[in-house]
Amino acid sequence: MNIVLEPGAAALLDALHRAGFGAYAVGGCVRDSLLGLAPHDWDLCTAARPGQVMELFGEDRCIPTGLQHGTVTVKRDGKLYEITTFRTEGRYSDGRHPDSVAFVPDLREDLARRDFTINAMAYSAEEGLCDPFGGREDLARGVVRAVGEPLRRFGEDALRILRLYRFAARFGFAIDEATEAAAKQLASHLDCVSAERIEEELNKLLAAPQPGAYLEPEVLAFVLPCLLYTSD
């Protein structure tokens, strides 16, 4: 299936390209487009540094939403677009957020830090689909699989464990065996995640067509301990 860029996103990407910066739509918008779904948001990534993005589009149109992580939100035609510089991430001492980030020129390095292969794809009209981890194949197979080493991905950010089941439930996908084994092994790390973020992910999971098939007891035991003692 061809990806049709939303007009505002296409215009921003074109401006970045004309200024000499590699730039792509990335993540969920690419995934949903390949599935034939309408993306809710269009996230963009680029080799341009945050200051260069703000200079290109003008400070009056830019919101410095996360400069330390390379993110600038750009206003265009009444919509907001997050543009993030390609980056790698350091250690996750708190099991939730990186201690540091480093801006890099290579898109593939940026994609390598992402959670699942189906979310680690990028697209531009000039270069087409960039899919170094087989996300498109996993979409076709109906599988959610971690990028790289699953234990590392979940060790970096325990909330990804719930995101694993949420994405599987949303799309009716199977879960890669090694990925699920790592999620169960590190489920206790969910203790480090705030109740608000856990509630948000659980609500999204429960909104899926058949959430019961993905409510994994070994994981929920660390999120909702009361379930261990529930009886009819």
Please state what every model-predicted region is:
Residues 1-232:
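Catalytic cores of the polymerase beta-like nucleotidyltransferase superfamily
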